[in-house]
C-alpha cells in the first residue's frame, strides 16, 4: 500500500486545495477598454510601508510583452488626504511619459529608452526631486513624512488601458526633515502663480478653487486632459543599479536637485539617490 496510499493522500489534499480556491492569485492592474477619467481612485494593488526619506519602487505590474509598433503612455498621480476628517483625496499629477513606435521583447524587460522610437516627458509644476519614472514605467519615490497616500497609475498600450494604485504608508524617521517631501512642496506653491493656474485648469479635476477645497471633494484628474501637464521636458536618461530612470530637464539638472535635496534630507540618505555621474 506504500506508494498507492501516498498517492491517494496527495490526491485528497489536492482536491481540498482546489476546493479552497487554489493558490492566491496575484493582484493585477485593472484592464479597461476605454480611457478614464475616473470618478474615484482605482483599486489598490496592495499596501506598502516605507520609512520617511527612504526609497521604494511602486510597480505597474503591466505585462508589456507580445506586441509592437504601438504608442505607450505611462502616468502617475499622488492622492493625499485633504484633512483628518474625510477620506476624500486631493490628486496631484506627477509624471507622464508618452512614447511612440514601441516594440516589446517577448522574453525580456520592456524599457522605454531602448524599445521605443521616441518619447515626450510631461511633468506637473508640483513635481520635484522626490520621485522619478524608471525605464519600464514604475515609480521610484522617496516620500517625506507627510507623503503617505494613494499613488495611482494609468498605462496605455495601443488600445488597451490599465489602471491601478498603491497605498503607501510612511513611517516617521528622526533623520527625515519635516520640510522635505511632495505634499510639503505642493502646499507651499503660491496659488496665484501662472504655473499653478495651468496645473489646476477647471477641466483637469484638480483643486482649482477655495470653494472646492472647502467641500473636500477633489476628484481624480481627467488624465486625458493636456492642461493637467503644464510642462514639456526633454528627458535625460540615467542608470541607477540595473534600472534606467527618466529625469525631466526642465526641473534643472539632476545634480542641482540632489544638492537641493541635501538641504532637506540627512547626509545619511544622500548617497541613495542616483548620482550626477550616472547622467550622460
From Swiss-Prot:
Residues 191-218 are annotated as: Disordered. Keywords: Glycoprotein, Signal. Residues 1-24 form the signal peptide. Glycans are attached at residues 85, 111. Coiled coil: none annotated. Disulfide bonds: none annotated. It comes from the Viruses. The PsHV-1 glycoprotein G does not seem to possess a transmembrane like the other family members. Belongs to the alphaherpesvirinae glycoprotein G family. This is Glycoprotein G. The gene is gG.
